[in-house]
Every structure is written in structure tokens, then in C-alpha cells.
Amino acid sequence: MSRQWLFSTNHKDIGTLYFIFGAWAGMVGTSLSILIRAELGHPGAFIGDDQIYNVIVTAHAFIMIFFMVMPIMIGGFGNWLVPLMLGAPDMAFPRMNNMSFWMLPPSLTLLISSSMVENGAGTGWTVYPPLSSGIAHAGASVDLAIFSLHLAGISSILGAVNFITTVINMRSPGITLDRMPLFVWSVVITAVLLLLSLPVLAGAITMLLTDRNLNTSFFDPAGGGDPILYQHLFWFFGHPEVYILILPGFGMISHIITQESGKKETFGNLGMIYAMLAIGLLGFIVWAHHMFTVGMDVDTRAYFTSATMIIAVPTGIKIFSWLATLHGTQLTYSPAMLWAFGFVFLFTVGGLTGVVLANSSIDIVLHDTYYVVAHFHYVLSMGAVFAIMAGFVHWYPLLTGLTMNPTWLKIQFSIMFVGVNLTFFPQHFLGLAGMPRRYSDFPDSYLTWNVVSSLGSTISLFAILYFLFIIWESMITQRTPAFPMQLSSSIEWYHTLPPAEHTYAELPLLTNNF
């Protein structure tokens, strides 16, 4: 057992570990979000202290981003699918792959510890000084959170190096870059973004650490520092990070839509690759749109508004190419396809509210209101999460060699769809009416939509529990698929289900008939 799970060098086993870890962290993060909605579900105090409330909000963000979405998308799907799609026997650095995983549990432990010592880190996930300084947040909490981020960051950087090396060096003959599957492209672009952005975050939080403990003044005006410098450094990481969260999802959705449409390739395959490259590049030059309210020059604001809107172009190319891939097909309403439809629709809605927020003048009013919360939860809670659900339902027979009950999956999708929309759609109204983020209480005039929102979160929770039940039922009954349900658009399906522990003992050769 310890040989297989503790010291594993097998990409499939490590991928499975990532899935289990991500699912566990996801349950912790979901519990925190239920606490947030319980607090906001009625006027007056429930938990009481705003510090505790902000600790919950901060932990919810960190856990969902660094310990749920990234481990599942990059660690789980990436590890499982990239070697299979490339025809590679494993990742380029199998032991480093294992180390990448085993840095995450200690990292999560440090994050949880930060909530339990002193008063917790109630800084929001951005950890802005002076709130995160040694005066406003005395004690070890923020320091523990910083070390947690360091560990998670090292884990991601090592993983990124591994994926980039694997894709450069371990492709089978015949898989040229232009014929490489879109999911592999999405993962390698994600890896480059991680490699370039995480060191900047590491620098920023290390400077914060020395400001707190070693008497430096990087972010303290009293010593000639500037807290705005921290914001620039953080968001130079933070904005690429949101594209890191969604890009692997783009790759998965491309595969699912292509395969379920019965097409042999995605519409505009090369355009899709260039669109992802453009999104990755542009993601680095728009960071200050998170800072429209800190007092930048008007020409700076004009630039960041324009650059942010340009990102909508490659994103639009992807949306319309997915629709074009669907064009002319007999639509199948399989569970994976339902998730993909939900993704395309809701991600588009989230993208549109993003274009609204890109206008610096409008953002002055909407900044730090629930409109922003609604925007990023539409692209994360219904973009990233729907992509994860789509990918899991689609590749579940490959991962386990079992099938889930499709009728139940469709019911579960419907419940989840209603739940997330009921949770986050009303938040647009709250934001437009001026309800601010990160407060545990609110004027009674905001009550109705907050009650609706909290009701939606309960429905979503039920949907997630139902999904866990469906997986459990599938594993108990052990229904095996007789054969893959559709013609494959990618080579990972040309295996036994699940694949043998060591696939591609002999290098596959891909010809033009592929």
C-alpha cells in the first residue's frame, strides 16, 4: 500500500490522489461557503464577530482555489490525461510529480492552522497590507497563511515544470504541436502561466513576511514603502491565476463537445490554440483592472480598460467555435453534454459581467460590491466547477472502468443548475444596489435577495451530496461499460477501461488516419 500510494511514481495513482485530495478540500470549502450564506441569510448577527466571518471568507477562497480547483484540474485531470493523450508512458519527472502532490496536504494543514491560532487571518484572499501588517493582524495567523501559500506555490511550480517538460519531450511520433489535443495545449499554457506568475506572488508575500517580522518597510509608508506596490505584485500573480483556473476547463470542454457532437475535431482547432495562447499572454497585462479605485492616472485606467476588453475577443472565439462544433449535430443530452452546455452558457454570462466591470468608470461604483462577487462566481462556481463536473462525468469510465446512472446524473445536473443560479444571480442586484463585500451584516433593504441567495446555496449543497451518492452507488454496484460509448476524438479511449497501470509499453505511432 505505501509503495503504491505514499511513494507512487505512477501518473494515474498520483492523479487519483489529487482527485481525492481535491474532493476532500472541496467539501471543506463548501462547508465554509454554507457558513457564509448562513450568516447572510438573515439580518443581524449569526456567527457574530466580523473577524471570524472574514477568516471564514478568506479560508473559503484559498481552499477553493489552491486546494480544490487547481489540484483537480491540473493535478487530477492533467496527470491522468496528458500522458495518455501524448502516448507517453508517464510524466517526464515521476518522482517530482509525487513531491508536487505531497506538498499540498502540509500546505492545507498550515492554512487550517492559521485559522485556529490567535484570531485567524481575516484579510481576504488578497492579504492586503496594512490590514495584514504586524499591527492590524498581530500573531502568527497571517505568517502561517503565507507559509501555506509558499508550499502550494512550490508544488504548482514543480508541477508546471513537469508538464512543460513532458509536453516538449514525450510526445509520440506523429503528434506534432498543431495536432496535439486541445486539453494538452490548455494544460501546457496553464503551466507556463504558473511558472511566470507564482514567483511574483512568492516575492510579494515574502516581503510581507519580512515587513511583519524583520522590521523592513516594503509596504509601510512610515519607512518609505508603499502598500500599493503590494497590490501591483499580488495582482500580477492574481490575474493570470484566474486564467490558470479556467484554461484547463476550456480544454476539457473542447474535448467533450467535440466527442459528444460526433465530430472528428473541434471547429477551428488551430484558432482555439491561438485563442488560448492569446488569453494566456493578455492575462499578464491587465492586472491593474483590480485596482481602479486606488487612484491611478486617467491614461493608465484607459489602457487597462481597453486591454481587459481585448481579452473578450479570444474568449469569444472559443465560445463561438464551441457553438460551431455543435452546429449541425443531432444534439445528445448526455450528462457530460449537459454540463458542457451549462458551462458555455453560464461562462458567457460571467464574461459579460466581466466586460461591464472592465469599464474603469463603472468599476468605481461596483468595486468591492456583490456585483464583483457575482461576476467571479459565475466564471468560477459555474465555469471552473461545471468544467470539472463535465470532465469527471465524461472521463469517469476511463478513470474507474465503471459507469454512473445517467438518469440520476441528469437530475443532479438540474438541481445544481438551479442551485448555483439561485445563489449567484441575485447577487448582481445586490451589487447594483450597493451592498458591499466582506461584511457579515447588511441593511434590511437587502434582505430579500440575500435570503434567495442563501436558499440557492442550500440547493447546491444538496446537489453536491447527491453527486457523491451517485459515485458511491456506481462503485458499489460495479457496472462496467461494455465499450466506450462514442467514437473517440482522442487516443486516451483506445485502452482498456480503466487503462493498465503501465500504458504505452511500446511507443504508439500516430498516422494521418488518426
UniProtKB/Swiss-Prot annotation:
Principal subcellular localisation of the protein: mitochondrion
UniProt-listed SUPFAM superfamilies: Cytochrome c oxidase subunit I-like (SSF81442)
Keywords: Calcium, Copper, Electron transport, Heme, Iron, Magnesium, Membrane, Metal-binding, Mitochondrion, Mitochondrion inner membrane, Respiratory chain, Translocase, Transmembrane, Transmembrane helix, Transport
Cross-link 1'-histidyl-3'-tyrosine (His-Tyr) placement: H239-Y243
Cofactor detail note: Binds 2 heme A groups non-covalently per subunit. Binds a copper B center.
Required cofactor(s): heme; Cu cation
An example Gene Ontology molecular-function term: heme binding
Reaction(s) catalysed by this chain's protein: 4 Fe(II)-[cytochrome c] + O2 + 8 H(+)(in) = 4 Fe(III)-[cytochrome c] + 2 H2O + 4 H(+)(out)
Family: Belongs to the heme-copper respiratory oxidase family.
Positions in coiled-coil regions: none
UniProt function note: Component of the cytochrome c oxidase, the last enzyme in the mitochondrial electron transport chain which drives oxidative phosphorylation. The respiratory chain contains 3 multisubunit complexes succinate dehydrogenase (complex II, CII), ubiquinol-cytochrome c oxidoreductase (cytochrome b-c1 complex, complex III, CIII) and cytochrome c oxidase (complex IV, CIV), that cooperate to transfer electrons derived from NADH and succinate to molecular oxygen, creating an electrochemical gradient over the inner membrane that drives transmembrane transport and the ATP synthase.
Pathway: Energy metabolism; oxidative phosphorylation
Lineage, broadest ranks: Eukaryota, Metazoa, Ecdysozoa, Arthropoda, Hexapoda
Residues reported to bind Ca(2+): E39, G44
Bilayer-crossing regions: 16-36, 55-75, 101-121, 144-164, 182-202, 233-253, 267-287, 304-324, 337-357, 379-399, 415-435, 451-471
Positions contributing to Cu cation binding: H239, H289, H290
Annotated binding of O2, by residue: Y243
Record GO biological process: aerobic respiration; oxidative phosphorylation; respiratory electron transport chain
Binding residues for heme a3: H375
EC number(s) recorded for this UniProt protein: 7.1.1.9
Cell compartments where the protein resides: Mitochondrion inner membrane
Protein's name in the database: Cytochrome c oxidase subunit 1
Binding residues annotated for Mg(2+), in chain numbering: H367, D368
